[in-house]
Every structure is written in C-alpha cells, then in structure tokens.
Amino acid sequence: MRDETPEQPAPLRFGYTTGSCATATSLAAARLLLGGRADDAVEIVLPKGQRVMMRLEFCRTTAAGAEAGTIKDAGDDPDVTHGALVFARVALSAAPGVRFHAGPGVGTVTRAGLTLPIGEPAINPVPRQMMTTHLDALAAEHGYTGGFDVTIGVEGGEALALKTMNPRLGIVGGLSILGTTGIVRPFSCAAYIASIHQGIDVARANGIAHIAACTGNASEDAMRAHYGLPDIALIEMGDFAGAVLKHLRRAPLARVSMCGGFGKLSKLAAGHLDLHSRHSSIDLPLLAQWAADAGASDALQAAMRAANTSQEALKLALADGVPLGDIVCAHALRVARDIVPASVAVEMFAIDRQGRFVGSAR
C-alpha cells in the first residue's frame, strides 16, 4: 500500500452561543427603538472582553416595539440549534430595568434545581447579564431612563428541544438560552456536561436520592426496568463518566448506579473518565490480564488478546467460566470510589448489545 501525504487539517472554527445571539438581537432591536438605526450587523462584548460582530437577518420595528434576528452559527461543532433563527422582540417600558420573557421556542422552568426559579423563562444567568449590560450601556448613551421588556425566541425551538434534555430537566415549551463565555468551542462538549450537572441537581432538588447514570438508550432502559426509576432519576451521561463522578464529589447524592455497554465500562475500569473513542480505547491485553488474575488459561488469554472486539473477548471469557463482566464492573467501581465521597453508595452494571446484564459490582 502506498503512503499518502496527510492533508493538514484546517483550524476548527469557533461559533457563538444562543446567549450571544440573544444579546446581539436584543441590542439591535433596542438600538432601533432608541436611535432609529436599523443595522445589518451588531458588535457585542463577550463575558471575557472579546468584541465580536454578529450579522443580522432582519432588524425592524413592530406594532409593540422592534425585533431583530440572527442565524445561530455553532462553528465546527454544530449542536441542535446550529442554523436556527434566534430573535429578540424589545419593547420600551416606563419601569426601569430589564425584564425577560420566553417567546416562541424558548422554554419555561417548571422544576426546582436549576439556576432559575420555577416559572422563569429558560434564559440562563450569563445571557441575562450580557443582555442587561448591553442594554444598560445603550440606555446611558441615549439618556434613556426607562426599562426594557425583552422576549427571546427560537424558530422551531419547541421541536428542537425534544432532542435535548430539557423535557427531563423540567424545562417545557422550548430550548434554553445558554452560554457562559459566549463562544462555542469545537468539541468542548461543555453544554452536554452542563446538562449532566443540571440533571443531577434537578434530581436532588426534587427529592431523588438514587440516580442512574447511563451511557445510552439501552443502558437507560435496563436501569429503568431493573429499578423502576422515574425519568428524572435517569442521567444521560453518554461518554462523560467523569462529569458524573466529579459532580457527585462536589455535590453528593445518597446513591448512584452507573450502567453502560461492556466496552464502555471496560474503559472506565481502566481509569478513563472520557469514554469516547477519540480519548480512550478498549485495552484487550488488560482484559486478558484481568481474566488471568481470575484463573484464565493461557489459551483463553491469547484468544482474548486476539479478539476483534470487547464483546468477543467477553463471550470467550464467559464460555470458559470467567466472570469478566463482574470483574470489569469491580475495577470500574474502584475507579469511581476513588473520586466520589464515601457517603455515596456506588454500583456498576455492564450490559451486552441486547441490553442484558453481563456484569455488576457494588
């Protein structure tokens, strides 16, 4: 086979959060009301001081005030809102201050445990502060002493929200307006990890003492059937086992069950906290060594090292009477126990590709 010269990858492109989109559009709409200026782009200042220019799809007056919209660009790590129209409708008010409202496609908080009170629009604290800072500065520039009513919406947001964890978190009717830095960093997965933390916090605030952190749908179904847990207690951790364990170290619960496919659990057992293939791989020689520690023959060890997949290695071990699923779960449990406080009861479950339990440890 001839060698090929690998192409040099282009730098990954950053994007902007829905919070940045909301800030840009609310500022543009308010500027139209106070200054009579309809811009096709607007500059905003991000929380860490960077200045960015965001293009607008429209900026126009309405019967109640003004509105502006922009297309959410998540850069080279597109999320569920990538390409969606985020818009702001702004009305002036005699009462000072900035009041936020959920427009079409933006959800409302209905459960305790989030950073916002029940009944509030799901516009997170940092985006609220970004909008308030920009609107206050605009008001001062124009000598305006009144306030602003700001309604944020996302076109199609109610349907998009069904692809997120919002329904499980108790955010109904649409998406959340998010962001802590204003920037979407490619493959940072910050939003996903934040949703894991929120899921744990919401469960705790609603009196749930036992959660199950699951790598996917099959493991979630297995935990739901095994324990009869409500959806609010089921945490979709994906590949981010470390996000669950480290959050529990900071904010413990009474009990956590972790469940995943055998291959994923074997990565955790080997000490990897990010189970994605970009960051960790299945170590067949290590599985063979663990089998050897349990009395596996030399022939079985060799067959396991030569296996094509972890599932094949598991099948070989079980056929020879070696409880590899339990062994892997026991090692994964030790990794977890090194992170979470002793007050947290931890247990591990491994499933096969049919969703059947093939190992456990507690």
Swiss-Prot record:
Q: Under which pathway is this protein filed?
A: Cofactor biosynthesis; adenosylcobalamin biosynthesis; cob(II)yrinate a,c-diamide from sirohydrochlorin (anaerobic route): step 6/10
Annotated SUPFAM superfamilies: CbiD-like
Return the Pfam families for the record. Answer: CbiD
Main EC class of this protein? transferase
- What Enzyme Commission number(s) appear in the record? 2.1.1.195
Catalytic activity field: Co-precorrin-5B + S-adenosyl-L-methionine = Co-precorrin-6A + S-adenosyl-L-homocysteine
Q: Name one GO biological process term.
A: anaerobic cobalamin biosynthetic process
Print the keywords alphabetically.
Cobalamin biosynthesis, Methyltransferase, S-adenosyl-L-methionine, Transferase
Note the InterPro entries from the entry. CbiD, CbiD_sf
Does Transcription count among this protein's keywords? no
State one molecular function term (GO).
cobalt-precorrin-5B C1-methyltransferase activity
The family classification in the record reads: Belongs to the CbiD family.
Under the heading PANTHER family, the entry gives:
COBALT-PRECORRIN-5B C(1)-METHYLTRANSFERASE
Q: What is this protein called?
A: Cobalt-precorrin-5B C(1)-methyltransferase
- What gene name does this entry carry? cbiD
